[in-house]
Amino acid sequence: PAEEVAALIRERGGKAVVDTHNVAEWAGAKAMVDKAVSEFGGLDILVNNAGILRDRMLINMTEDEWDSVVKVHMKGTFAPMHHAGNYWRAQQKAGKKVDARIINTTSHSGLFCNIGQANYAAAKAGIASLSLVAARELSRYGVTVNAIAPRAETRMTQGLRELTPEQVERRDPAWISALVTWLASPEGAKISGKVFEAWGYGYAVAESWQHGPITPASKDPSELGPRVEEIIRFSRKNAGIDRDTWLDI
């Protein structure tokens, strides 16, 4: 598929190269960044979208199923960001103006929970938090960082469930790529540290964890029952954690 996409870009007058290094490997991620700089004379935009699924209930999940998913998603996002960030820092220190973008891929599973995806959800939640940290750290170098939680039908999700024609249309990746393109454009220069939900029904900002009700602390566990019950009673339910509240998309 990568070769097909590159060929299509060339047919339409663009320039494209394919790199087959493993972005979940430290040296592979660096080689990819170095190749982009070498082929195009610089690096302006990094979109992290590597992912795999190894779905299984937590108590049945194997160590390899956990490790492989977390490595591809988490390290496969962190490693390219690390090497790209070092490139942009060096550019800035050399006196060059940097106006760069990083767009990461998180998931509704990571933001709102999904049974049977402990490995995937943990990795995607980590990517969301990683994106917020990176947005703060890399802003000094002229880099914006955002993340997108897409709902799209891709090679990774085909066959997981039957979809109506309307759902297929609403899961067209074109809805997602439009937002990615906008965030990567000059218009997106002031947007950083945000996590977006994106699908054919619309775009939304996923609001992060907030401080909820508070109660006085105690070193005596016997005093905590009523206090914890009170703050739970006045707290909001974790957003979207009950799948019955999700849009049927």
Task: Annotate each predicted stretch with a short phrase.
Residues A147, E166-I249:
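C-terminal helical subdomain
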Residues T20-A31, E63:
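The beta1-alpha1 cofactor-binding region of Rossmann-like NAD(H)/NADP(H)-dependent oxidoreductases
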Residues S107:
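Residue(s) in the substrate-gating loop at a strand-loop-helix junction
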Residues R12-V17, D34-N48, R54, K97, ...:
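A glycine-rich helix->loop->beta "capping" turn
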Residues K15, G42-I45, A128, A135-P150, ...:
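Conserved Rossmann-fold SDR core element
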Residues M57-L58, E65-D67:
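Substrate-binding pocket helix/loop in short-chain dehydrogenase/reductase
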Residues M81, A123, S131:
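Active-site helix of classical SDR
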